[in-house]
From Swiss-Prot:
The lineage of its organism: Bacteria, Pseudomonadati, Pseudomonadota, Alphaproteobacteria, Rickettsiales. It is found in: Cytoplasm. The keyword Chaperone does not apply. Its cofactor is Mg(2+). Its main location: cytoplasm. Mg(2+) 2 binds at E69. GO terms for cellular component: cytoplasm; Holliday junction resolvase complex. This is Crossover junction endodeoxyribonuclease RuvC. Homodimer which binds Holliday junction (HJ) DNA. The HJ becomes 2-fold symmetrical on binding to RuvC with unstacked arms; it has a different conformation from HJ DNA in complex with RuvA. In the full resolvosome a probable DNA-RuvA(4)-RuvB(12)-RuvC(2) complex forms which resolves the HJ. The active site is at D8, E69, H141. It comes from the Bacteria. GO terms for biological process: DNA recombination; DNA repair. The gene is ruvC. HAMAP family: RuvC.
Length: 162
């Protein structure tokens, strides 16, 4: 059994999802959530919240592998830079906790889940709910994290060719 944490880094909201994958690549959903920092805190405080909360999630679930979305360049350079800070903290936590990190482009994740690399968020959520039956996930950040984790399973299992 392999336990995987999927991560969708963000400064305001960092989505996470935990799944187990058995030797036949069957997926069992264990949990998901969002680390919210709010915008009233300073930059350093927000990064510290992400750091501490993600460490707690990893400690609680003890995943053996991590899957994270690669950063994309936004039209707004400030947004891209801020996302980079949050992503850097997530990578630091993965390094500190000695988790193997696997990075995936957003379009690759979408293609592996929906068959369309340019699918919108609703299409991704719809397909994630088809893959994980009886899933009640409300936040798209957690759904994105789950999609990244599922993408990792598909990639490891050679179900999907890049």
């Amino acid at each position: 059994m392999t336990r995987i944490i999927g991560l969708d880094p963000g400064m305001s909201k960092t989505g996470w999802a935990i799944i187990d994958m058995d030797e036949r690549s069957n997926i069992e959903f264990l949990g998901s959530g969002t680390i919210s920092t709010g915008n009233k805190l300073g930059m350093g405080e927000r990064l510290h919240v992400i750091f501490e909360q993600l460490k707690k999630v990893i400690s609680l679930y003890s995943p053996s592998e991590a899957a994270i979305e690669k950063i994309f360049v936004n039209k707004n350079p400030k947004s891209s830079l801020t996302l980079g800070y949050a992503r850097g903290i997530v990578i630091l936590v993965l390094e500190i906790t000695e988790l193997t990190m696997n990075e995936y482009d957003t379009n690759y994740v979408k293609k592996s889940i929906t068959g369309n690399g340019h699918a919108d968020k609703d299409q991704v959520i719809f397909m994630v709910k088809q893959i994980i039956k009886n899933l009640n996930i409300k936040c798209h950040h957690a759904a994105d994290a789950l999609a990244v984790a599922i993408c990792h399973v598909y990639t490891k299992s050679s179900y999907f060719v890049r």
